[in-house]
Amino acid sequence: MSATGQYLLEELEGRLSPILATTFGYYSLQVGCAGLADRLQQACRVKHQFTLGEADQENHIQANPSMLPVASDSVDLVILMHHLSNTSEPHAILREVFRILIPEGKLVIIDFNPKSLWGLRHFFQSWLEHVPFKGHFYTAKRIDDWMRLLGFDQNRLYRIGYLPPIQKPSLIRHLSWLEKGMR
C-alpha cells in the first residue's frame, strides 16, 4: 500500500472506530474494499460481521449488492466502502440497504468528495496511471437527497482526506496539518 493509502486508511480508522465501537447488534455487512474489512472492523461490537467479497473466505458473501441474499430488516450495520462511486446503480444499492437494515440500523457511506483534491484527481484519471477508484463521485448533497427519499435520517457527516493525492511520505508528514486544521 502506498504512503498516501496508508495515511488515508489510518484517518478512516480514526473516524470509524468510535462509530463502530458504539454500534451493537447481531449482524453487520461491509460492501466494497473487502480486503480492508478485518482491519476496519476491529472496533466493531456487532456480533457477526460479513463482507461482500470473495466467497472462498470466511464471513464473505458473494452476491450482487443490488440483490442481496439477506432477509429484510435483519442487519444492524451496513458499511458502503467506496461502493456508490463504483457502481452503475447507486439507487438500487441504497434501496437494497434500506430493505435489509433494521428500523434503527446504521448505514456508513465512505467515498470521495468530487469537490476535493481527490475528486480533481479523479477528473484527470485518463492521464494518470494508478487511480484507485474510477467511478462517479457523488456530492454529499446528492447522497443526502437520495437518503431522504428512502427515509434515512443523516446523523453525522465526517470528511477526511484533505491532503492532496501525493506519494512522498515526507511531504505527507509536512502537510498533515491540513487534515487536522479542517476538522
What feature does the model see in each segment?
Residues M1-A21:
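Class I SAM-dependent methyltransferase Rossmann-like catalytic core
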Residues S66-V78:
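A short acidic, Gly/Pro-enriched loop at the edge of an enzyme's catalytic core
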Residues R159-R183:
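A C-terminal cap/extension of S-adenosyl-L-methionine-dependent methyltransferases
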